[in-house]
Amino acid sequence: MSATRLDVPVVRLPHGMDLPLPEYATAASAGMDLVAAVPAEVPLVIAPGAWALVPTGLALELPEGMEAQVRPRSGLALKFGVTVLNAPGTIDADYRGEVGVILINHGREPFTVSRGMRIAQMVIAGVQQITLVETGNLGETARGVGGFGSTGLDRTP
């Protein structure tokens, strides 16, 4: 199945001019890698348990009805314990500032973010706005009010 591609205007900010634009790694990739626009001579070090806002050097003009989700890269999480703190971070269609990534280091060692390092994924998705309608009751379901583990952990018979 071939999806229709949208053109999304992007601005490279002065501190990101030499960095590659995000792109899909494979034909079936859902996300595009975002890279760090930290100064080459001053890498960003995130101590264990600390977090930092990492610049990307990019600003987007998303179409109305779309959002960009900033998600972790699984390799950083598995190898270093580094992930996106507010995953998924949301970039609204009316935001025009720099895309930033809040990384947190859950690892045991300091983590160094260097210029051009792939730090997160950006997934573009549609948004459906709703209107909440206050009511006195909700329709019944098999699950009911069960939540937070109410369906169990073990799926073996």
From Swiss-Prot:
The keyword Hydrolase applies. Belongs to the dUTPase family. PANTHER family: DEOXYURIDINE 5'-TRIPHOSPHATE NUCLEOTIDOHYDROLASE. It comes from the Bacteria. Disulfide bonds: none annotated. GO terms for molecular function: dUTP diphosphatase activity; magnesium ion binding. InterPro entries: dUTPase, dUTPase-like, dUTPase-like_sf, dUTPase_trimeric. One of its GO terms (biological process) is dUTP catabolic process. This enzyme is involved in nucleotide metabolism: it produces dUMP, the immediate precursor of thymidine nucleotides and it decreases the intracellular concentration of dUTP so that uracil cannot be incorporated into DNA. It comes from Azorhizobium caulinodans (strain ATCC 43989 / DSM 5975 / JCM 20966 / LMG 6465 / NBRC 14845 / NCIMB 13405 / ORS 571). Pathway: Pyrimidine metabolism; dUMP biosynthesis; dUMP from dCTP (dUTP route): step 2/2. This is Deoxyuridine 5'-triphosphate nucleotidohydrolase.
